[in-house]
């Protein structure tokens, strides 16, 4: 396995998550819900740190980090863009689903690439923990602002 190729694949997953959260941001502006917008911006910042840290490791390996999505990533973003969000709750549910998909993908990536250096494994473990925290943030938002549960 070429470490940088695998890390670029992982980085493209992060780019996909960032692209999907941009869609949520655009859609959330329609609802004039400042708490929702604030939450999405906060999560985008988390994704940005993931992008920066992963890019740094790829560059340290002497390779160029990708700025693009995989074909599957492009299709995933396109599919998300086609969704109609009628209320903030719809964005919350979609964000929980996509974050869960990212969490599962990161866990699978870590399992499939067990020979990665410890520094890289730690980065991916941190991403996994952040995805768990993001899910918790969404649940807290739903409980505090939507009032459904």
Question: Model features per residue range: what roles?
Answer:
Residues 23, 42-45, 81:
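Long, non-catalytic architectural segments outside compact domain cores
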Residues 35-70, 138-144:
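Conserved alpha-helical segments that form or flank metal/cofactor-binding pockets of metalloenzymes
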């Amino acid at each position: 396995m070429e470490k940088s190729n695998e890390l670029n694949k992982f980085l493209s997953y992060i780019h996909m998550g960032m692209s999907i959260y941009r869609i949520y941001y655009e859609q959330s502006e329609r609802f004039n819900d400042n708490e929702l917008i604030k939450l999405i911006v906060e999560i985008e910042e988390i994704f940005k740190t993931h992008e920066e840290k992963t890019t740094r490791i790829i560059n340290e390996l002497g390779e160029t980090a990708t700025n693009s999505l995989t074909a599957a990533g492009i299709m995933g973003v396109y599919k998300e863009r086609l969704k109609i969000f009628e209320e903030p709750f719809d964005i919350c549910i979609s964000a929980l689903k996509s974050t869960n998909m990212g969490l599962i993908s990161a866990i699978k990536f870590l399992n499939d690439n067990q020979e990665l250096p410890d520094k890289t494994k730690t980065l991916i473990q941190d991403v996994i923990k952040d995805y768990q925290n993001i899910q918790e943030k969404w649940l807290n938002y739903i409980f505090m602002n939507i009032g459904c549960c």
